[in-house]
Amino acid sequence: MRDYIELTKPRITWLILMSTGIGYFFGLPQASNWLTFLKNIDLLRLLHTIIGTGLIASGTAALNQWYEREGDLKMHRTAGRPLPSGRLIAGRALAFGVALSIAGFVELWLGVNLLSAGIGAFTLASYLFLYTPMKRRTWWSTTVGAIPGAMPPVIGFAAAAGGLTRESWVLFAILFLWQFPHFYSIAWMYKEDYARAGIQMLPVVDPDCRSTARQIVIYGIALIPVSLVPALLGMSGRLYLVGALLLGLWFLYSGVRVALERTLVRARGVLITSVLYLPLIYGLMLLDRPGL
Protein backbone atom coordinates (compact mmCIF):
# COMPACT_ATOMS: atom_id res chain seq x y z
CA MET A 1 0.00 0.00 0.00
CA ARG A 2 2.84 2.39 0.83
CA ASP A 3 4.25 2.01 -2.67
CA TYR A 4 0.91 2.87 -4.26
CA ILE A 5 0.66 5.95 -2.06
CA GLU A 6 4.16 6.96 -3.11
CA LEU A 7 3.09 6.72 -6.75
CA THR A 8 0.57 9.50 -6.12
CA LYS A 9 3.26 11.97 -4.95
CA PRO A 10 1.32 13.10 -1.85
CA ARG A 11 3.30 16.31 -1.27
CA ILE A 12 2.71 17.56 -4.79
CA THR A 13 -0.93 16.48 -4.61
CA TRP A 14 -1.33 18.48 -1.40
CA LEU A 15 -0.03 21.61 -3.17
CA ILE A 16 -2.44 20.97 -6.04
CA LEU A 17 -5.37 20.65 -3.65
CA MET A 18 -4.38 23.83 -1.82
CA SER A 19 -4.45 25.71 -5.13
CA THR A 20 -7.76 24.07 -6.05
CA GLY A 21 -9.25 25.18 -2.74
CA ILE A 22 -8.14 28.77 -3.30
CA GLY A 23 -9.76 28.72 -6.72
CA TYR A 24 -12.96 27.34 -5.23
CA PHE A 25 -13.17 30.02 -2.56
CA PHE A 26 -12.66 32.82 -5.07
CA GLY A 27 -15.31 31.31 -7.30
CA LEU A 28 -17.88 31.86 -4.56
CA PRO A 29 -19.92 35.09 -4.46
CA GLN A 30 -18.37 37.88 -2.40
CA ALA A 31 -19.87 38.12 1.08
CA SER A 32 -20.20 40.94 3.60
CA ASN A 33 -18.86 38.87 6.50
CA TRP A 34 -17.34 35.51 7.36
CA LEU A 35 -20.67 34.01 8.41
CA THR A 36 -22.26 34.74 5.06
CA PHE A 37 -19.14 33.55 3.27
CA LEU A 38 -19.23 30.24 5.12
CA LYS A 39 -22.94 29.84 4.36
CA ASN A 40 -22.15 30.20 0.65
CA ILE A 41 -19.87 27.17 0.76
CA ASP A 42 -21.52 24.03 -0.54
CA LEU A 43 -19.52 21.55 1.51
CA LEU A 44 -20.60 18.56 -0.56
CA ARG A 45 -19.58 20.25 -3.82
CA LEU A 46 -16.28 21.30 -2.26
CA LEU A 47 -15.69 17.72 -1.12
CA HIS A 48 -16.42 16.37 -4.60
CA THR A 49 -14.07 18.99 -6.05
CA ILE A 50 -11.22 18.08 -3.73
CA ILE A 51 -11.71 14.33 -4.15
CA GLY A 52 -12.04 14.52 -7.93
CA THR A 53 -9.05 16.81 -8.39
CA GLY A 54 -7.00 14.73 -5.96
CA LEU A 55 -7.79 11.55 -7.88
CA ILE A 56 -6.83 13.10 -11.22
CA ALA A 57 -3.63 14.54 -9.75
CA SER A 58 -2.74 11.20 -8.16
CA GLY A 59 -3.53 9.29 -11.34
CA THR A 60 -1.44 11.68 -13.40
CA ALA A 61 1.49 11.27 -11.02
CA ALA A 62 1.24 7.48 -11.19
CA LEU A 63 1.02 7.44 -14.98
CA ASN A 64 3.93 9.85 -15.23
CA GLN A 65 6.08 7.54 -13.12
CA TRP A 66 5.00 4.57 -15.22
CA TYR A 67 6.07 6.41 -18.38
CA GLU A 68 9.39 7.58 -16.92
CA ARG A 69 10.31 4.39 -15.06
CA GLU A 70 13.40 3.66 -17.18
CA GLY A 71 14.72 7.20 -16.90
CA ASP A 72 14.02 7.24 -13.16
CA LEU A 73 16.30 4.22 -12.78
CA LYS A 74 19.23 6.32 -14.03
CA MET A 75 18.69 9.13 -11.52
CA HIS A 76 19.92 8.93 -7.94
CA ARG A 77 16.97 11.04 -6.78
CA THR A 78 14.33 8.75 -8.29
CA ALA A 79 15.96 5.30 -8.41
CA GLY A 80 14.29 4.36 -5.13
CA ARG A 81 10.78 4.97 -6.41
CA PRO A 82 8.43 1.95 -6.50
CA LEU A 83 8.83 1.19 -10.23
CA PRO A 84 12.58 1.59 -10.85
CA SER A 85 13.35 -0.17 -7.57
CA GLY A 86 11.22 -3.15 -8.63
CA ARG A 87 8.83 -2.98 -5.68
CA LEU A 88 5.91 -2.58 -8.09
CA ILE A 89 5.49 -4.02 -11.55
CA ALA A 90 4.72 -1.64 -14.40
CA GLY A 91 1.35 -3.18 -15.29
CA ARG A 92 -0.09 -2.63 -11.84
CA ALA A 93 1.13 0.96 -11.72
CA LEU A 94 -0.43 1.61 -15.12
CA ALA A 95 -3.77 0.12 -14.08
CA PHE A 96 -3.66 2.07 -10.82
CA GLY A 97 -2.99 5.36 -12.60
CA VAL A 98 -5.70 4.80 -15.20
CA ALA A 99 -8.26 3.83 -12.54
CA LEU A 100 -7.52 6.91 -10.42
CA SER A 101 -7.69 9.22 -13.42
CA ILE A 102 -11.02 7.85 -14.66
CA ALA A 103 -12.46 7.95 -11.14
CA GLY A 104 -11.38 11.57 -10.75
CA PHE A 105 -12.97 12.60 -14.04
CA VAL A 106 -16.23 10.86 -13.17
CA GLU A 107 -16.19 12.38 -9.68
CA LEU A 108 -15.84 15.90 -11.06
CA TRP A 109 -18.36 15.31 -13.84
CA LEU A 110 -21.12 13.79 -11.71
CA GLY A 111 -20.35 15.46 -8.39
CA VAL A 112 -19.46 18.96 -9.58
CA ASN A 113 -19.93 19.96 -13.23
CA LEU A 114 -18.76 19.10 -16.72
CA LEU A 115 -16.58 22.20 -16.99
CA SER A 116 -14.38 21.28 -14.04
CA ALA A 117 -14.19 17.69 -15.30
CA GLY A 118 -13.18 18.91 -18.75
CA ILE A 119 -10.45 21.13 -17.33
CA GLY A 120 -9.24 18.20 -15.26
CA ALA A 121 -9.10 15.99 -18.35
CA PHE A 122 -7.22 18.70 -20.26
CA THR A 123 -4.75 19.01 -17.40
CA LEU A 124 -4.06 15.28 -17.37
CA ALA A 125 -3.80 14.98 -21.16
CA SER A 126 -1.52 17.98 -21.65
CA TYR A 127 0.75 16.87 -18.81
CA LEU A 128 1.08 13.26 -19.94
CA PHE A 129 0.98 13.59 -23.73
CA LEU A 130 2.72 16.95 -24.24
CA TYR A 131 4.91 17.86 -21.28
CA THR A 132 6.20 14.41 -20.32
CA PRO A 133 7.46 13.37 -23.81
CA MET A 134 8.89 16.85 -24.43
CA LYS A 135 11.19 16.58 -21.40
CA ARG A 136 13.59 14.41 -23.41
CA ARG A 137 13.55 16.71 -26.42
CA THR A 138 13.70 20.33 -25.31
CA TRP A 139 14.02 22.49 -22.22
CA TRP A 140 10.92 24.35 -23.41
CA SER A 141 9.00 21.47 -21.85
CA THR A 142 8.99 23.47 -18.61
CA THR A 143 6.90 26.18 -20.29
CA VAL A 144 4.46 23.62 -21.66
CA GLY A 145 4.26 21.82 -18.32
CA ALA A 146 3.52 25.07 -16.50
CA ILE A 147 0.15 25.26 -18.28
CA PRO A 148 -1.38 22.09 -16.75
CA GLY A 149 0.57 22.91 -13.59
CA ALA A 150 -1.38 26.15 -13.22
CA MET A 151 -4.82 24.62 -13.83
CA PRO A 152 -5.78 23.50 -10.27
CA PRO A 153 -7.16 26.92 -9.16
CA VAL A 154 -9.05 27.12 -12.46
CA ILE A 155 -10.67 23.75 -11.69
CA GLY A 156 -11.63 24.99 -8.23
CA PHE A 157 -13.02 28.26 -9.57
CA ALA A 158 -15.08 26.48 -12.23
CA ALA A 159 -16.43 24.11 -9.59
CA ALA A 160 -17.72 26.96 -7.42
CA ALA A 161 -18.78 29.48 -10.05
CA GLY A 162 -19.90 27.17 -12.83
CA GLY A 163 -17.88 29.27 -15.27
CA LEU A 164 -14.61 31.12 -15.74
CA THR A 165 -13.96 34.84 -15.35
CA ARG A 166 -10.87 37.04 -15.38
CA GLU A 167 -10.37 36.29 -11.67
CA SER A 168 -9.82 32.62 -12.45
CA TRP A 169 -7.16 33.49 -15.01
CA VAL A 170 -5.39 35.79 -12.57
CA LEU A 171 -5.02 32.81 -10.22
CA PHE A 172 -3.79 30.78 -13.19
CA ALA A 173 -1.22 33.45 -14.10
CA ILE A 174 0.22 33.66 -10.58
CA LEU A 175 0.71 29.91 -10.36
CA PHE A 176 2.01 29.74 -13.94
CA LEU A 177 4.79 32.27 -13.31
CA TRP A 178 5.63 30.87 -9.87
CA GLN A 179 6.53 27.50 -11.35
CA PHE A 180 9.56 28.69 -13.32
CA PRO A 181 11.81 29.75 -10.42
CA HIS A 182 10.54 26.75 -8.46
CA PHE A 183 11.28 24.08 -11.07
CA TYR A 184 14.40 25.71 -12.48
CA SER A 185 15.90 25.68 -9.00
CA ILE A 186 15.08 21.97 -8.61
CA ALA A 187 16.55 21.21 -12.04
CA TRP A 188 19.65 23.22 -11.10
CA MET A 189 20.17 21.17 -7.94
CA TYR A 190 19.77 17.85 -9.77
CA LYS A 191 21.10 18.70 -13.23
CA GLU A 192 23.59 15.80 -13.23
CA ASP A 193 20.74 13.42 -12.49
CA TYR A 194 18.62 14.86 -15.29
CA ALA A 195 21.56 14.66 -17.70
CA ARG A 196 22.06 10.96 -16.90
CA ALA A 197 18.40 10.31 -17.68
CA GLY A 198 18.53 12.31 -20.91
CA ILE A 199 16.05 14.91 -19.70
CA GLN A 200 16.62 18.27 -21.38
CA MET A 201 16.00 20.66 -18.51
CA LEU A 202 17.42 24.17 -18.92
CA PRO A 203 20.31 23.68 -16.45
CA VAL A 204 21.34 20.56 -18.40
CA VAL A 205 21.75 22.46 -21.68
CA ASP A 206 23.06 25.51 -19.81
CA PRO A 207 25.97 24.01 -17.83
CA ASP A 208 27.12 27.24 -16.17
CA CYS A 209 23.46 28.04 -15.33
CA ARG A 210 23.84 31.62 -16.51
CA SER A 211 20.67 31.46 -18.62
CA THR A 212 18.88 29.53 -15.89
CA ALA A 213 19.63 32.27 -13.36
CA ARG A 214 18.48 34.89 -15.85
CA GLN A 215 15.19 33.06 -16.36
CA ILE A 216 14.64 32.82 -12.61
CA VAL A 217 15.10 36.59 -12.28
CA ILE A 218 12.88 37.37 -15.29
CA TYR A 219 9.99 35.29 -13.98
CA GLY A 220 10.51 36.69 -10.50
CA ILE A 221 10.14 40.20 -11.91
CA ALA A 222 7.06 39.22 -13.95
CA LEU A 223 5.41 37.62 -10.94
CA ILE A 224 5.38 40.85 -8.89
CA PRO A 225 2.93 42.92 -11.00
CA VAL A 226 0.78 39.89 -11.79
CA SER A 227 0.52 39.03 -8.09
CA LEU A 228 -0.81 42.54 -7.41
CA VAL A 229 -3.70 42.20 -9.86
CA PRO A 230 -6.05 40.53 -7.31
CA ALA A 231 -6.00 43.77 -5.31
CA LEU A 232 -6.69 45.84 -8.44
CA LEU A 233 -9.66 43.61 -9.34
CA GLY A 234 -11.13 43.77 -5.84
CA MET A 235 -10.37 40.14 -5.07
CA SER A 236 -8.29 41.26 -2.08
CA GLY A 237 -7.54 44.50 -0.27
CA ARG A 238 -4.66 46.72 0.78
CA LEU A 239 -3.18 44.23 3.22
CA TYR A 240 -2.81 41.76 0.39
CA LEU A 241 -1.41 44.45 -1.91
CA VAL A 242 1.38 45.32 0.51
CA GLY A 243 1.99 41.70 1.50
CA ALA A 244 2.11 40.47 -2.10
CA LEU A 245 4.58 43.21 -3.00
CA LEU A 246 6.86 42.31 -0.10
CA LEU A 247 6.62 38.59 -0.83
CA GLY A 248 7.35 39.22 -4.49
CA LEU A 249 10.41 41.31 -3.67
CA TRP A 250 11.60 38.59 -1.29
CA PHE A 251 11.15 35.95 -3.99
CA LEU A 252 12.95 38.16 -6.51
CA TYR A 253 15.77 38.77 -4.03
CA SER A 254 16.42 35.04 -3.84
CA GLY A 255 16.58 34.97 -7.64
CA VAL A 256 18.98 37.90 -7.82
CA ARG A 257 21.24 36.21 -5.29
CA VAL A 258 21.45 33.05 -7.39
CA ALA A 259 22.17 35.16 -10.47
CA LEU A 260 25.05 36.90 -8.70
CA GLU A 261 26.38 33.74 -7.10
CA ARG A 262 25.50 30.68 -9.17
CA THR A 263 25.86 27.97 -6.54
CA LEU A 264 23.78 25.05 -5.32
CA VAL A 265 23.30 26.84 -2.00
CA ARG A 266 21.69 29.82 -3.74
CA ALA A 267 19.60 27.54 -5.95
CA ARG A 268 18.34 25.77 -2.86
CA GLY A 269 17.50 29.18 -1.42
CA VAL A 270 15.25 29.89 -4.41
CA LEU A 271 13.54 26.53 -3.91
CA ILE A 272 12.91 27.15 -0.21
CA THR A 273 11.61 30.66 -0.90
CA SER A 274 9.26 29.35 -3.59
CA VAL A 275 7.86 26.68 -1.28
CA LEU A 276 7.09 29.33 1.35
CA TYR A 277 5.86 31.97 -1.08
CA LEU A 278 2.83 30.16 -2.45
CA PRO A 279 0.96 29.30 0.78
CA LEU A 280 1.80 32.75 2.18
CA ILE A 281 0.38 34.63 -0.78
CA TYR A 282 -2.67 32.35 -0.91
CA GLY A 283 -3.26 32.91 2.79
CA LEU A 284 -2.99 36.68 2.41
CA MET A 285 -5.34 36.62 -0.56
CA LEU A 286 -8.01 34.76 1.37
CA LEU A 287 -7.50 36.62 4.65
CA ASP A 288 -7.87 40.02 2.99
CA ARG A 289 -10.82 39.21 0.79
CA PRO A 290 -13.14 42.27 0.79
CA GLY A 291 -16.03 42.03 3.21
CA LEU A 292 -14.47 39.30 5.34
From Swiss-Prot:
Q: In which compartments does the protein localize?
A: Cell inner membrane
The gene that this protein is the product of is: ctaB
Give, as one word, the top-level EC class.
Answer: transferase
Alphabetized InterPro entries for the sequence: Protohaem_IX_farnesylTrfase, UbiA_prenyltransferase, UbiA_sf
For this entry, list what GO says about its biological process: heme O biosynthetic process
So what family is this one in?
A: Belongs to the UbiA prenyltransferase family. Protoheme IX farnesyltransferase subfamily.
Can you tell me where the transmembrane regions are? 12-32, 43-63, 94-114, 115-135, 144-164, 169-189, 216-236, 239-259, 267-287
Q: Which residues form a coiled coil?
A: none
Q: What is this protein called?
A: Protoheme IX farnesyltransferase
Q: Which GO terms describe its molecular function?
A: protoheme IX farnesyltransferase activity
State the remark under miscellaneous: Carbon 2 of the heme B porphyrin ring is defined according to the Fischer nomenclature.
Arranged from A to Z, the UniProt key words for this protein are: Cell inner membrane, Cell membrane, Heme biosynthesis, Membrane, Transferase, Transmembrane, Transmembrane helix
Under the heading PANTHER family, the entry gives: 4-HYDROXYBENZOATE SOLANESYLTRANSFERASE, PROTOHEME IX FARNESYLTRANSFERASE, MITOCHONDRIAL
What CDD domains would the database entry show?
Answer: PT_UbiA_Cox10
The annotated topology with respect to the bilayer is: Multi-pass membrane protein
Q: In which pathway does it act?
A: Porphyrin-containing compound metabolism; heme O biosynthesis; heme O from protoheme: step 1/1
Q: Which Pfam families match?
A: UbiA
Kindly give the Gene3D superfamilies that the UniProt entry links to this protein.
Answer: UbiA prenyltransferase
**Known EC number(s)?**
2.5.1.141
Q: What does this protein do?
A: Converts heme B (protoheme IX) to heme O by substitution of the vinyl group on carbon 2 of heme B porphyrin ring with a hydroxyethyl farnesyl side group.
Reactions it catalyzes: heme b + (2E,6E)-farnesyl diphosphate + H2O = Fe(II)-heme o + diphosphate
Q: Which GO terms describe its cellular component?
A: plasma membrane
